[in-house]
């Protein structure tokens, strides 16, 4: 230390004090510009209470871009949300069930469509059943049907098939084979449904029994729909739910940031592909 002190031209006692001085605790970082984003972040969190900071960041940047303002880094949004207690509680539970290593994602749209049925239980005990079909690549829900008090029928699935083909191809027959992935429920496996699918150019594919993971795209959508829509809206009875469902599906397709699409919505992704 004497040699270093001589080279630097300072007293040894001063150098010793600098080396052994306790490091001052670093205060929390607070950038003035962060506070300008806080009202926007609070509003988005109030509107989307199930969204984590990455999806909130996507929505923040969507609004900033519309106003011609520069994007906010996700770390900045995280910092603001953490400082103001707006972060979601981290999930620490183990994922139940077996792991699935099969490939469920395809490389372009209109190669595989995934279909499934799920239920929403209303506060009065009534049950709404929903059948839907979603594209495995761009994640847009192509068609859906909802009923209360009854099960999903084969005719509903066939209507779904026709609506999806008409939406994507503007005709009643797909120009190439499209896989239709579902479970082994009777509405999907009925002979009339299989024959109808073939006439439309669809190729029915079925997951193994008791393996919902094999239809991972559809399974993930059901979790998203229940978490981000059904659980945060009033569900007093079936009539109320049925009145809201169309708006939920449209919001998912148009606005929901999807991690598999780079945090943009399915329709934003489709529009980006078309340009």
Question: What is each stretch, according to the model?
Answer:
Residues 1-275:
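Charged DNA-binding/catalytic regions of mobile-element recombinases
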